[in-house]
Curated annotation (Swiss-Prot):
Tissue expression profile of the protein: Expressed by the venom gland.
Alphabetically ordered keywords of this record: Disulfide bond, Growth factor, Pyrrolidone carboxylic acid, Secreted, Signal, Toxin
Location in or out of the cell: Secreted
GO terms, molecular function: chemoattractant activity; growth factor activity; toxin activity; vascular endothelial growth factor receptor binding
Start-end of Basic and acidic residues biased regions: 133-146
Keyword Kinase annotated: no
Source taxonomy: Eukaryota, Metazoa, Chordata, Craniata, Vertebrata
Family: Belongs to the PDGF/VEGF growth factor family. Snake venom VEGF subfamily.
Keyword Secreted part of the UniProt annotation: yes
Region (Disordered): 118-146
Protein name (Swiss-Prot/TrEMBL): Snake venom vascular endothelial growth factor toxin
Gene3D superfamilies: Cystine-knot cytokines (2.10.90.10)
Role: Snake venom VEGFs that may contribute to venom dispersion and prey subjugation by inducing vascular permeability and hypotension. This protein induces an increase in capillary permeability after intradermal injection, as well as a drastic hypotensive effect after intravenous injection. The hypotension is mediated by nitric oxide (NO), which is produced by VEGF-activated endothelium NO synthase. Also induces angiogenesis in vitro. Like other crotalid VEGFs, this protein interacts with VEGF receptor-1 (FLT1) with a high affinity, whereas it binds to VEGF receptor-2 (KDR) with a low affinity.
Transmembrane segments: none
Amino acid sequence: MAAYLLAVAILFCIQGWPLGTVQGQVMPFMEVYRHSVCQPRETLVSILEEYPGEIAHIFRPSCVTALRCGGCCTDESLECTATGKRSVGREIMRLSPHKGTSEKEVMQFTEHTDCECRPRSASGVNSRKHKRNPEEGEQRAKFPFV
């Protein structure tokens, strides 16, 4: 029994380590840099965020993987932006509680094929660095919309 518990503890410890590294090992600079650049990355995408008109349904899984641009640019005035896109299908299960039905179907999602660091839009820079408050003239919605 003790050997079993030790094996389980070791398994949990190993699963917590980043893939391809050994605990205590330092990832070399070029590998860190290669992983951080602006490029398409596997990202979890919420089905309801992509299809907000489908709130009457439950989806399983509730999110899918898709390649989306992400990573660092060399300057804060730049952002990682998609320069190429394609549509990909993902098979999901749609549950309709009001009808009491469920069915598999293919839903389309946008996937990024190419990414590039491009200048941020003027509104993007302002909204990230400075959030306005009611005293500055911004109208805020009342409760429950905070």
